[in-house]
Amino acid sequence: MIETKRLYVRLFREEDAEALYKIKTDPQVMEYCPDLLDVKVEREDIPRYIREFQALEDSGDIDEWRCYAIENKETGEIMGALTFSKQKMLHEYELGWMMIGAYTGKGYASEAAEAFAEYFCEGHGIDYLIVVMDVDNPASRRTAEKSGFRLFEKRTVYDYSYNRYCDDYFYFRRYWTGSILKDRYYGDSPYYGR
């Protein structure tokens, strides 16, 4: 479990099934993250997914997709989720987030992402994490920047994702503070690393 000033970032538990279903069915989440779990997942399927998350965590294999709860320390409410996976095409570790609409714009996602990135990189000896997002998602761009990710480049690929065709996306990186590579890639140009 990761603790921040206002949050816990932890594995989902079976008692969080309703909260995870709420995240999965939130219209704001679905706009950019329709592939969270399976597209046609039903409420009764959620506990099985949570057990799979636990099994993946227990396996220690960091190359497999994972999903963590973002919990409000004060209220115990699950407000969103962080996802982590080894991006198949890029062969890099990718972090993602999704917040229930009522909790957006309050800095929770950036607080969770920053803490998770530092904790995970340090714990696994990973130099950096990436975030990949549609250029039409300005809220996620702000979250990435607030949590220490820097725009590395804008890439083009013709892909059907997020329920629509997307040809441009932003590619961000956040280096672990202990990484010797950090200074090599974080320059002063608008596209860091170029």
PLM-predicted stretches and their roles:
Residues 106, 122-127:
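Short coil/turn segments at alpha/beta junctions that flank glycine-rich nucleotide-binding fingerprints
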Residues 9, 20, 95, 113-116, ...:
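Hydrophobic packing within well-folded, soluble alpha/beta domains
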Residues 1-102, 123, 164-194:
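GNAT-family acyltransferases
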Residues 130-132, 150-167:
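Conserved catalytic-core motifs of GNAT/GCN5-like acyltransferases
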Residues 97-99, 105-119, 138-146:
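Conserved acetyl-CoA-binding loop-helix of GNAT-fold acetyltransferases
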Residues 84-86, 117-118, 135, 161:
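Short, contiguous, well-ordered secondary-structure segments
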Residues 41, 138, 159-161:
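Generic structural signal for helix capping and beta-alpha/helix-loop junctions
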Residues 12, 119-121, 149:
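Conserved hydrophobic/aromatic "anchor" residues
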